[in-house]
């Protein structure tokens, strides 16, 4: 073992945390808590825009369900208990008083149904993202950091709220 490897191993923290578990081992409750916390983090970072944009997480298992925010709530109002569980067809699968934004469902169901390794999907409305999206030519890869997105950006026509 190299000296660097020994230092890394010596500084390793054995903390039992849901963020360090294998995704397949996470319970729905843990995913709800993490997703609600993620909504608050996105709000804190200034990446939210009113009620628009969505964060979703796929629930492990054969049912192909995922959690999404209730339509009409601001990001800082989303809680673990008011997240809505839906299937890939947009059906709400547990009793709730909330609806789901159809545009959010369209975007996230497309990703969750086609990318089995995309456990969590984020669609935000940052100022920088909205500015880029308004450009006729879309994302221009003019520097090193932008090159990470070369041939990796997909566009979807707006289907309305």
Task: Pin down the residues of each PLM region.
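Glycine-rich flexible loops
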Residues: 1-161
